[in-house]
Amino acid sequence: MHKPQSFFHLHLISDATGETLLAAGRAAAAQYKNARAIEHIYPLVRTEKQLEKVFASIDEEPGIVLYTIVDQKLARQVDERCQAMGLPCVSVLEPVLAVFQSYLGTPAGRRVGAQHVLDAEYFRRIDALNFTMEHDDGQLPHNVEEADIVLVGVSRTSKTPTSIYLANRGIKTANVPIVLDAPLPEPLLNAKRPLVVGLIASAERISQVRQNRLLGASHVDFDAYVDRAEIARELAYARQLCNRHNWPVIDVTRRSIEETAAAILALRGKSW
């Protein structure tokens, strides 16, 4: 008999694009078939202020923390904060750098993003990541016209991780939440340039993810937030909005982030 699949939060903090962390985290998570990692990616974290925002998010959804941060002061802060919160924390590159240093006899150069070639493509990706982080969860709706892609959907339909995945490929991606009976921002409805794509999932999947998100946390509308009938209403409203504006819809229930991104890029290829 199969054990029911459980969920855990995997927080990935990087001072560059986060691709190294993502690969390492997924390689480790793949060894645990009955535990699904809910990924939270924080790229371009290079200041204490940015780190504060990261830990505010981690505090809401505690889990495993992996990081690659060159600045040793920031790295120590990550270790100290995780220790204070009782969270497991690993610097992914530090053990590898220690081996290199021991063998080569010289310390590492400590260059941010040194594994990436600093060419035009790299800077395009960094620009896209900056844009995507600034336009997460409906932020700065007034300049959504500058996006290449806008993802819309109800809470917990993988909008943010999919946005970051696309940004890592140099695509400026904004995402906007759909809230039951609430209108969408006017700038989005009037936008001509970006491809707008709706993301949905089954009510069962969304309820499961939301319940896991709220474990150990208080939420005034807990019952409504995880109620499948209520979620079905949210999804019906989301479909209605997408149909009204002729936006394509992708069901992410059984798709990985990569598969969802591939489907979006296929739509983008048709529209450009």
Swiss-Prot record:
<dbReference type="GO" id="GO:0004674">
    <property type="term" value="F:protein serine/threonine kinase activity"/>
</dbReference>
<dbReference type="Pfam" id="PF03618">
    <property type="entry name" value="Kinase-PPPase"/>
</dbReference>
<dbReference type="GO" id="GO:0043531">
    <property type="term" value="F:ADP binding"/>
</dbReference>
<dbReference type="GO" id="GO:0016776">
    <property type="term" value="F:phosphotransferase activity, phosphate group as acceptor"/>
</dbReference>
<dbReference type="InterPro" id="IPR005177">
    <property type="entry name" value="Kinase-pyrophosphorylase"/>
</dbReference>
<dbReference type="GO" id="GO:0005524">
    <property type="term" value="F:ATP binding"/>
</dbReference>
<protein>
    <recommendedName>
        <fullName>Putative pyruvate, phosphate dikinase regulatory protein</fullName>
        <ecNumber>2.7.11.32</ecNumber>
        <ecNumber>2.7.4.27</ecNumber>
    </recommendedName>
</protein>
<keyword id="KW-0808">Transferase</keyword>
<dbReference type="InterPro" id="IPR026565">
    <property type="entry name" value="PPDK_reg"/>
</dbReference>
<keyword id="KW-0547">Nucleotide-binding</keyword>
<feature type="binding site">
    <location>
        <begin position="153"/>
        <end position="160"/>
    </location>
    <ligand>
        <name>ADP</name>
    </ligand>
</feature>
<keyword id="KW-0418">Kinase</keyword>
<comment type="function">
    <text>Bifunctional serine/threonine kinase and phosphorylase involved in the regulation of the pyruvate, phosphate dikinase (PPDK) by catalyzing its phosphorylation/dephosphorylation.</text>
</comment>
<comment type="similarity">
    <text>Belongs to the pyruvate, phosphate/water dikinase regulatory protein family. PDRP subfamily.</text>
</comment>
<keyword id="KW-0723">Serine/threonine-protein kinase</keyword>
